Design a protein with these regions (language model features):
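Beta-rich strand-turn-strand
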Residues: 133-143, 149-152
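Flexible, glycine/small-residue-enriched loop-and-beta-strand segment within the central core
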Residues: 8-9, 15-32, 37-135, 164
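Conserved catalytic-core motifs of eukaryotic protein kinase domains, centered on the activation segment
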Residues: 82-83, 155, 171-173
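Short, charge-rich, low-complexity interaction segments located
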Residues: 164-173, 178
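Leloir-type glycosyltransferase catalytic cores
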Residues: 112, 117, 185-199
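ABC ATPase nucleotide-binding domains
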Residues: 193-212
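Conserved G/P- and acidic residue-centered "switch" motifs that form tight phosphate/ATP-binding loops
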Residues: 145, 163
Length: 212
């Protein structure tokens, strides 16, 4: 993980590896990998984002681990805050953000409860526009989350899900190809290897023949 720089813009080649941060971005207790881009209007709290991943703007991400090469479209929400629906007489956040209303100290135990519902997103995941990943879910490597999907359950590797609540509608590859890709762990290749093999990434058959 590296320090962040601002604003979000194309940098000189020697600075490509530095995370690029847009305007009106709040980062609290978070870590960003190399080549990460965070576009405008985002709140990211207690989250780790892996190398080469990006957000497209207007995003909220809380208490999450995001893998490498993850594509996060506009208006995606990851781990929106649960309210105490069953535990308390009132659902309103005055019961745990009490200081904002002059009603005493905040309830730190409640925020610890939220942290326990961590979200994990694997590598090379594509999360479509306006999708929501609910607290506690895990999304496997290579998965696709459709536009406006609400993910309430774990999503398997290379699965394609869509809908409210999200359901599996297909797979990107067959089991054999998935196993070969997983074995390669290409997302862990160093930058020079990625650069050298970039043309091969653009053709699945060529890539599979050479590296899988």
């Amino acid at each position: 993980m590296t320090d962040i720089i601002s604003p979000f813009s194309l940098a000189e080649e020697q600075n490509y590896a530095q995370p690029k941060i847009g305007q009106q971005v709040e980062l609290n207790g978070s870590q960003l990998g190399q080549y990460v881009h965070i576009a405008d209007n985002a709140i990211i709290e207690e989250t780790q984002i892996g190398d080469y991943s990006y957000t497209a703007g207007n995003n909220q991400i809380f208490y999450a681990t995001i893998g490498k090469f993850v594509s996060i479209a506009t208006y995606v929400r990851i781990n929106p805050g649960n309210h105490p629906t069953y535990q308390r007489v009132a659902q309103h956040h005055f019961t745990y953000r009490s200081s904002a209303y002059g009603l005493g100290e905040d309830d730190q135990d409640f925020f610890d409860w939220r942290r326990e519902h961590h979200v994990t997103v694997g590598n090379d995941v594509w999360i479509g526009h306006n999708a929501v990943l609910m607290p506690g879910v895990t999304v496997g490597n290579g998965a696709v989350i459709g536009t406006s999907a609400v993910v309430t359950k774990d999503v398997g590797p290379y699965s394609i899900v869509a809908g409210v609540a999200a359901k599996k509608i297909g797979m990107r590859f067959d089991d054999n190809m998935i196993a070969r890709i997983e074995k390669s762990q290409w997302w862990n290749w160093d930058h020079e290897t990625l650069k050298e093999r970039m043309p091969d990434f653009r053709d699945l058959a060529v890539f599979a023949e050479k590296y899988l």
